[in-house]
Amino acid sequence: MGFAPLLVFSLFVFAGTTKGFICSFDSIYQLGDSFSDTGNLIRQPPDGPTFCSAHFPYGETFPGMPTGRCSDGRLIIDFIATALNLPLLNPYLQQNVSFRHGVNFAVGGATALDLSFLAARGVQVYDVHSPLSTQLKWFRTYLGSICSSPKECSNKLKNALFILGNIGNNDVNYAFPNRSIEEIRAYLPFITEAVANATREIIRLGGTRVIVPGMFPLGCLARNLYFFPDGDKDDLGCLSSLNDLSIYFNSLIQQALASLRIEFPQAVIIYADYYNAWGFLFRNGPALGFNSTTMLKCCCGIGGPYNYDPDRECASQGVPVCSNPTEYIQWDGTHFTQAAYRRVAEYIIPDIIKELKCSYSSIQHLTEGREALHINERE
């Protein structure tokens, strides 16, 4: 699978590498897909309210009702906001809410590539109208509402953190039908270019600190395991060929970010290693509190070895939900549980904080308070 071995993080070691620096973020701007969407998809006419994330049991763990998050509760972006002592981001399409501390532009089902690009190559995308280019348009519109000149905009964004993704897995999923792995692989450079161009635009508009997550292991998703029952499996039961796609895409993204760092030396551009973060989780799940018998099974779903049936999805009538989502990694076959997102956040946040040169004191609440992340539980 190519996952990194079990890693041990110590807050005491981490503190020593960052002492003397202060994190001064006053806002976060998130672009991406359903792994980051906090409520935009369900507010898009005409079909928004019909999407599953608008219905229970989505949101059952937090906040106790559906919010548009494709999970039982919080997402990685929520834990990042909490770690930086900022409020959870409101979705761009929600009315009468505050955007003082940032905006979430991510939309469930979004692609990195424009829909016209995909359509020209025979890739059909249904019910999705807000690819990455649309989210950038929203950001430009928002920016125009808070500043009127490049200098003023740069000043407004000087203490902002941008997170671009993860995004790109939908481009791959939509292209799967009737295409070989080799054909899908040929799409990845185009997806990489779209992400790189979006990063470039964010920096040109005034962003100076940008996180670009990589792709998670596609071969471990219950949905993909359902659709490729005869695929080659690794020792964890994940599809090796699909995970190889993720690895290849991540190598392309890292190369693109290296070039962007040369192009924009004034910016801090961080690669977030989602692949190994999720790999850590799948490989060490039982030690982290997850049930060893349900690692690849859905908490909310029905049927088959993975508790997943695309014709009877989570939130559909008669589809059950597990009573213990904290013991499951997978939520609905395509997305993950709050418990899983929390653990991935634990994995990536220390590296992000270190690269952003934040002080230990600025992340004390990672291990204190009611929303503690307990990074040191790996020890």
UniProtKB/Swiss-Prot annotation:
What is the role of the protein in this entry?
Acetylesterase involved in the biosynthesis of ajmaline-type monoterpenoid indole alkaloids (MIAs) natural products, important plant-derived pharmaceuticals used in the therapy of heart disorders. Deacetylates 17-O-acetylnorajmaline to produce norajmaline. May also catalyze the conversion of 17-O-acetylajmaline to ajmaline.
Q: Report the EC number(s), separated by commas if there are several.
A: 3.1.1.80
Pathway assignment? Alkaloid biosynthesis; ajmaline biosynthesis
Hydrolase as UniProt keyword: yes
Glycan-carrying positions:
96, 178, 197, 291
Could you list this entry's UniProt keywords, alphabetically sorted.
Alkaloid metabolism, Glycoprotein, Hydrolase, Signal
Q: What is this protein called?
A: Acetylajmalan esterase 1
Superkingdom, taxonomy of origin: Eukaryota
**Catalytic activity, per the record?**
17-O-acetylnorajmaline + H2O = norajmaline + acetate + H(+); 17-O-acetylajmaline + H2O = ajmaline + acetate + H(+)
Report the family membership: Belongs to the 'GDSL' lipolytic enzyme family.
Q: What class of enzyme is it?
A: hydrolase
Q: Which residues form the active site?
A: 34 (nucleophile), 332, 335
